[in-house]
């Protein structure tokens, strides 16, 4: 009898414990995503704890390119949670900017090179497969981001460049047409009338500060190398070199990132910037998140800031801090530049950092916006006093 009583009490005890555990599970709050505001100069972050349902799906892009974000968000919402739409959203969003000639720094008719021609760079990266499709120095084809998608989907290559990229585009059904407009021609004519100032040449003769060339190499003593690194001749600024960089994430944490640009104004023909370079202009990894960059591509591409930001998030840094780390690596070596980074983790937390401007605007669409899902946000950039004591990463 005592044995049966002990057994019954033991069963009741186990049942009570199990019930308590289940009750605790069922009544515990829904997990939230830590995303506290960062007080560091030049960074911004999601300012309140949000659940996954409130953050995803999402679209985020550089600058106040609203129409591109609105279209990408509309496409993402065509399926529940944005599933299987992230690539479409990024490509069509960037394509919208190409058609609108956003700030004259994306798409045709902007940033003429030294010969007066506009060329295009673009990239698409799949965070699930790590596959990339990119084009650089694309001539006579308006749909750069869509050609990049064809490189991704129809070749085993990562990037095609120049006239060969244009021939590939023709083979894929894209039509050739001039990328020069009356506005871009006038920009070029005015530049040449002002002795081609400013330009990107150095260590050549005749003096590139007062002439248009043609130039020949000028021997440079080793003692001049440090001096020649200065970039005072050509200031890259807000209206000189904007890139649309866009990230889309669905509710299953599938990520695509993309970029499109017409490059630096009055660039030397053949120049390619950071936008089509994986890890520089953009980087995406479903296991971690994604980042996109904009600014002085000649400087930024040397440091792969988008990759650095993603790897910082992999190491546990929140997106805002990860974005700042990407810029700090550059600042350790080069302080005369302008640039910005957006970083987003796989759960939809995001942050941005910038340098060389007063502030950096970017567009976000997500459920967190409630009755205003598409919104413009800004981050104040690292100020002059913050330029010192940059730590090595």
From Swiss-Prot:
SUPFAM superfamilies for this protein: N-terminal nucleophile aminohydrolases (Ntn hydrolases) (SSF56235)
Keywords from the UniProt entry: Autocatalytic cleavage, Disulfide bond, Hydrolase, Protease, Signal
PTM section of the record: Cleaved into an alpha and beta chain by autocatalysis; this activates the enzyme. The N-terminal residue of the beta subunit is responsible for the nucleophile hydrolase activity.
Any single Gene Ontology cellular-component annotation: lysosome
GO biological process: protein deglycosylation; proteolysis
GO molecular function terms listed in the Swiss-Prot or TrEMBL record: N4-(beta-N-acetylglucosaminyl)-L-asparaginase activity; peptidase activity
Disulfide bonds: 97-102, 196-212, 354-381
Binding site for substrate: 271-274, 294-297
Alphabetized Pfam families for the sequence: Asparaginase_2
Signal peptide segment: 1-23
Class of enzymatic activity (EC top level): hydrolase
Catalytic activity: N(4)-(beta-N-acetyl-D-glucosaminyl)-L-asparagine + H2O = N-acetyl-beta-D-glucosaminylamine + L-aspartate + H(+)
Gene3D superfamilies in alphabetical order: (Glycosyl)asparaginase
EC number annotated for this UniProt entry: 3.5.1.26
Record-annotated active site: 243 (nucleophile)
Function of the protein: Cleaves the GlcNAc-Asn bond which joins oligosaccharides to the peptide of asparagine-linked glycoproteins.
Subunit structure: Heterotetramer of two alpha and two beta chains arranged as a dimer of alpha/beta heterodimers.
UniProt similarity note: Belongs to the Ntn-hydrolase family.
Protein name per the record: Putative N(4)-(beta-N-acetylglucosaminyl)-L-asparaginase GM21137
Organism: Drosophila sechellia (Fruit fly)
């Amino acid at each position: 009898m005592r044995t049966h009583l002990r057994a019954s009490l033991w069963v009741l005890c186990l049942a009570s414990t199990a019930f308590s555990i289940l009750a605790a599970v069922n009544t515990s709050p829904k997990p939230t995503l830590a995303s506290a505001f960062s007080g560091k100069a030049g960074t911004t972050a999601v300012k309140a704890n949000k659940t996954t349902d409130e953050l995803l799906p999402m679209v985020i892009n550089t600058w106040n390119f609203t129409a591109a974000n609105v279209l990408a968000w509309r496409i993402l919402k065509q399926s529940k949670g944005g599933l299987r739409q992230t690539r479409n959203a990024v490509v069509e969003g960037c394509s919208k900017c190409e058609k609108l000639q956003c700030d004259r720094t994306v798409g045709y008719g902007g940033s003429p090179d030294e010969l007066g021609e506009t060329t295009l760079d673009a990239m698409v990266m799949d965070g699930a497969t790590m596959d990339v499709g990119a084009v650089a120095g694309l001539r006579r084809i308006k749909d750069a981001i869509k050609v990049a998608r064809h490189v991704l989907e129809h070749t085993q290559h990562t990037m095609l460049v120049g006239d060969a990229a244009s021939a590939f585009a023709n083979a894929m059904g894209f039509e050739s047409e001039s990328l020069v407009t009356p506005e871009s021609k006038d920009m070029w004519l005015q530049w040449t009338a002002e002795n081609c100032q400013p330009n990107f040449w150095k260590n050549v003769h005749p003096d590139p500060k007062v002439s248009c060339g043609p130039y020949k190499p000028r021997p440079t003593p080793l003692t001049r190398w440090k001096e020649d690194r200065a970039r005072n001749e050509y200031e890259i600024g807000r209206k000189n070199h904007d890139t649309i960089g866009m990230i889309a994430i669905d509710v299953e944490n599938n990520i695509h990132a993309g970029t499109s640009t017409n490059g630096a104004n009055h660039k030397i023909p053949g120049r390619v910037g950071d936008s089509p370079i994986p890890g520089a202009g953009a980087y995406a990894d479903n296991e971690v998140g994604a980042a996109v960059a904009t600014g002085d591509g000649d400087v930024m591409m040397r440091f792969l800031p988008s990759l650095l930001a993603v790897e910082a998030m992999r190491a546990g840094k929140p997106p805002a801090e990860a974005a700042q780390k990407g810029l700090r690596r550059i600042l350790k070596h080069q302080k005369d530049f302008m640039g910005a980074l957006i970083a987003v983790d796989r759960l939809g937390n995001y942050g941005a950092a910038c340098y060389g401007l007063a502030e950096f605007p970017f567009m976000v669409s997500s459920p967190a916006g409630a009755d205003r899902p598409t919104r413009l946000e800004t981050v104040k950039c690292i100020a002059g006093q913050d330029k010192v004591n940059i730590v090595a990463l």
